[in-house]
Amino acid sequence: MGSAIDFDLDGHLDILGQQPLLQMYTQICFAFPVADSSSYSAITKTLADGLERLSASFPWVAGHIVNEDSGEGNTGVFKIKPLDKSPSLIVKDFRNDPSFPTMEAIKKAGFPFSMLNEDIIAPRKTLPVRSDTPEISPVLVVQADLITGGLLLVFAGQHNAMDMTGQGQVIHLFSKACRNEPFTSDELVSGNLDRRTLVPLLDDSYKQGHELARQISQPRPPPSSDGPPPPKLDWTYILFSPTSLAELKSLAQKTITFPSSFISTDDTLSAFVWQAVARSRLPRFDASAKTTCARAVDVRSYLGVPSTYTGLLQNVTYDTFTLQKLVNEPLGSVASALRSGLDPKRPNDLGFSTRALVTVLSRTLDKNTFSFGGTVNPSLDFMVSSWAKLDSYELDFGLGLGKPEGVRRPQFQPLESLGFLMPKTQDGEIAFALCLMEEDMKRLRADEEFTKYGVFVG
């Protein structure tokens, strides 16, 4: 399989991974059909053996996250420490549980949130809960859910240690390990890079500027016991077929305003959903209220870091419109605005702003001061992250089951205004995960302009 690159686990997490608000797990579920029920024992053995091979070459994936030297006004240091020989593989068998849906039923329903609850199918909750937060925070945990006619394979990656791009690469490497394929020298190097010096700091002359203004954490008032109950929130998946995506992009290309004359499918779909969310909110807000799209971006290419780097290296772009302007703008104009935030030629581009954030974090004892969410107002703003480029639908993990038929993030605690583009299927479909207030979601479901292209599956 190739040998691991020698490195010291102690202090292995990079500076971006030192943010306490990243103490959470990112989950992704692969759904496979299983025709022969006698194959489950071979499946679990393949997975267990694959985790051992993965850990032999990338030992940090078998570690756990610890925090050291924290105290009053000091969030301490997050590190990866050795834990086990390999990440845990949890196996749960739901085949005799009549309340658990079959693979056929889940597929027929479109792999909805309602059938993929993290409390049941995932090895860790996304967000920490004081009453049940485990003392140990493994870097990676895998759960194999055996269901009638299928397998749900769920990965939970600790967010201080990896973003979704990094986690996607870890899963890609795990699939190779399950197939007993050797890792390339490039994979071994990029998967074991020393994270501490990966992003060069700005020199001592740098003074914090407006490029970080959006990432200063804003204290939120505690909920009042005398106030109204919090609004009910709803998660849903919306499916966009290859035809719908092509039509949306063609429509957007007619009104591009960014000089490069290029917008991506991600730009277009993110803009389309943001505009629709704004329309759903107009009845509740003044049309002059401002809304911001906070878009997570993989910044590896801006910093000369390999695309296969398995850690955390992301930042966020921010675009702001009034609600009225946003809903009235042509789709191409909004998509162009989102694209312009990725331009490496613009002043204070993502490379510089990421180095600035890393520099300031390195100088700051209390790293709760900064977060990617920063000034985001969930009631008005929109946070979106794209997993569309992950090769999830190409992975078979050597299980003899073929490629996955569905890849989804399991349902977790509702977070208003959060959206994800799921990995693109082999035929080009994208499932968009979205969480809104129930009343906004109801208006979105009735929005004919939106439902012309997107199909709700829940």
From Swiss-Prot:
Protein family according to the UniProt entry: Belongs to the trichothecene 3-O-acetyltransferase family.
GO MF, one annotated term: acyltransferase activity
Superkingdom of the organism of origin: Eukaryota
Entry annotated with the keyword Acyltransferase: yes
Keywords on record: Acyltransferase, Transferase
Pfam families per UniProt: TRI-like_N
UniProt pathway annotation: Secondary metabolite biosynthesis
Mutant lacking the gene: phenotype: Abolished production of cryptosprioptide C and D, but retains the production of cryptosporioptide A, however, in smaller quantities.
Broad class of enzyme this protein falls into: transferase
Lineage of source species: Eukaryota, Fungi, Dikarya, Ascomycota, Pezizomycotina
Region (Disordered): 211-231
InterPro entries per the UniProt record, alphabetical: CAT-like_dom_sf, Sec_Metabolite_Acyltrans, Tri101-like_N
Protein role: O-acetyltransferase; part of the gene cluster that mediates the biosynthesis of the dimeric xanthones cryptosporioptides. The pathway begins with the synthesis of atrochrysone thioester by the polyketide synthase dmx-nrPKS. The atrochrysone carboxyl ACP thioesterase dmxR1 then breaks the thioester bond and releases the atrochrysone carboxylic acid from dmx-nrPKS. Atrochrysone carboxylic acid is decarboxylated by the decarboxylase dmxR15, and oxidized by the anthrone oxygenase dmxR16 to yield emodin. Emodin is then reduced to emodin hydroquinone by the oxidoreductase dmxR7.
Bias type Pro residues, positions: 219-231
EC number: 2.3.1.-
Alphabetical list of PANTHER family matching this protein: FAMILY REGULATORY PROTEIN, PUTATIVE (AFU_ORTHOLOGUE AFUA_3G14730)-RELATED (PTHR31896), TRICHOTHECENE 3-O-ACETYLTRANSFERASE (PTHR31896:SF64)
Name of the protein in question: O-acetyltransferase dmxR13
Species whose genome carries this gene: Cryptosporiopsis sp. (strain 8999)
Key word Transferase present: yes
